[in-house]
């Protein structure tokens, strides 16, 4: 999530499943529920939320890899920065 977040940066998470495009979502990895991912919400799709990382061209897991994120996998979102 660089440039928004640096590797290892600690974050506050607002516990909610209410998202909108532009939010930064915190969710369980659909491929391994023990992992937690942080990605930007792009849009709502049938079956869930389309999320993407901020580094284009990188082969990091996002909805291009695992498809839309089921709303039940959402743990929350990061507070909006001013």
Give a label for each model feature.
Residues 1-82:
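Extended hydrophobic leader/signal-anchor segments used for secretion and membrane insertion
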